Amino acid sequence: MISNGIGTVTTGKRSMCLFPLLLIGLWGCVTCHRSPVEDICTAKPRDIPVNPMCIYRSPEKKATEGEGSEQKIPGATNRRVWELSKANSHFATAFYQHLADSKNNNDNIFLSPLSISTAFAMTKLGACNNTLKQLMEVFKFDTISEKTSDQIHFFFAKLNCRLYRKANKSSELVSANRLFGDKSITFNETYQDISEVVYGAKLQPLDFKGNAEQSRLTINQWISNKTEGRITDVIPPQAIDEFTVLVLVNTIYFKGLWKSKFSPENTKKELFYKADGESCSVPMMYQEGKFRYRRVAEGTQVLELPFKGDDITMVLILPKLEKPLAKVERELTPDMLQEWLDELTETLLVVHMPHFRIEDSFSVKEQLQDMGLEDLFSPEKSRLPGIVAEGRNDLYVSDAFHKAFLEVNEEGSEAAASTVISIAGRSLNLNRVTFQANRPFLVLIREVALNTIIFMGRVANPCVN
């Protein structure tokens, strides 16, 4: 008998709880093993013997029309790291569309696709057979030129180094991974070593069998500490029980200051028009200045607001009045998004943007199953022999929880050099383009050089805290 966050299943198999977050929960280990690698960011592939129990080789795919016009890879960037970032963007848009389809058009949405992808990449370390194949396909890891699944982990380490070890500290972007394993279980040493070296996921033994509720509280407290208290109570009651073997958690925290701040004196109450035709009053921020902007297909406006340091930006996608945001969501593709971003040019703008705070919490299980990740969640079909020492095939993921938070105000964003242009009053805006986000819009927070989508969401009702 195992209980998960959704229901109860009768089976002889053991469960792993998966908690993406901004977080995720999965596996575990009992003893910690030191690796000779001193710094993963300067290591070479030969320095990190990634030898999981199973390796999947992606089949060769025929070139399709249009291939060969690839973007120029940024300088000093590993090609495979660039491809991994693109794979994450493909997964982000696909997962977002599945999630949006399951929600009401008036619901806010916010998530970190990078957090979800990272946590399931860690799961992939112990996967075999069709379970491994589905993980490679659903998360688009099979699009990376390096065709063997074991090398993905090395490229994830390099991607994390690019994102989280920046010399510029004007924005705060922090990620943390942790394994919480049942203290009675002995876990595969290779799995432990790779998890710690590549993902920085150290083991903390807990007593799931003897005190499941205290274990749940301990994990939730760790998550809260790593997100500055912004993410709490991710794991719901009864999600962990005596059948839980391991929980893997990934957290991402971002806090950034606008490169060009909004003056609080310019913030006024204005109406925001929701998808159902109703309106509500919201503090609307305002400023005039030069920003990267483009009006694209069917009048959709795309605006990029940089944070200090210019390496991380917020992208807003605002449909014209006559076009529902749901239509933009359904039509959006990774290539379309990349094309829009490439076309942005510096434009003198009048920006109206709501002051808002949104929080979202959901299970990712149903969406991932719809995308083809079925075996991992099946007690009968799951194959995760590379996690425990004895190579058992009785483990599966019972559920996967995700919780994310975003706050945007005059100073910047919390989720995260040129002259500041701020007008102390509202002018007549002659010869200026107006970007007025007084209706539902999409929001992305991305790392610019690699175009890595860190966060993604929909602001449908900023009046709800």
Swiss-Prot record:
Keyword Chloroplast appears in the UniProt entry: no
Superkingdom to which the source organism belongs: Eukaryota
Sorted UniProt keywords: Blood coagulation, Disulfide bond, Glycoprotein, Hemostasis, Heparin-binding, Phosphoprotein, Protease inhibitor, Secreted, Serine protease inhibitor, Signal
Tissue: Plasma.
Binding residues annotated for heparin, in chain numbering: W82, R162, R178
Annotated positions for site Reactive bond: R426, S427
Xref: InterPro entries: Antithrombin_3_serpin_domain, Serpin_CS, Serpin_dom, Serpin_fam, Serpin_sf, Serpin_sf_1, Serpin_sf_2
Modified residues (Phosphothreonine): T64
GO cellular component, one term: extracellular space
Biological process annotations from GO: blood coagulation; regulation of blood coagulation
Glycosylation sites: N129, N168, N188, N225
Residues found modified as Phosphoserine: S69
Pfam assignment, any one: Serpin
Cellular localisation: Secreted, Extracellular space
Presence of the UniProt keyword Nucleotidyltransferase in the record: no
Disulfide bonds: C41-C161, C54-C128, C280-C463
Post-translational modification summary for this protein: Phosphorylated by FAM20C in the extracellular medium.
GO molecular function annotation: heparin binding; serine-type endopeptidase inhibitor activity
Signal peptide: 1-32
PROSITE patterns, A to Z: SERPIN
UniProt main location, coarse: secreted
PANTHER family xref list: ANTITHROMBIN-III, SERINE PROTEASE INHIBITOR, SERPIN
Family: Belongs to the serpin family.
Function recorded in the entry: Most important serine protease inhibitor in plasma that regulates the blood coagulation cascade. AT-III inhibits thrombin, matriptase-3/TMPRSS7, as well as factors IXa, Xa and XIa. Its inhibitory activity is greatly enhanced in the presence of heparin.
Subunit comment: Forms protease inhibiting heterodimer with TMPRSS7.
Name this polypeptide is given: Antithrombin-III
Gene designation: SERPINC1
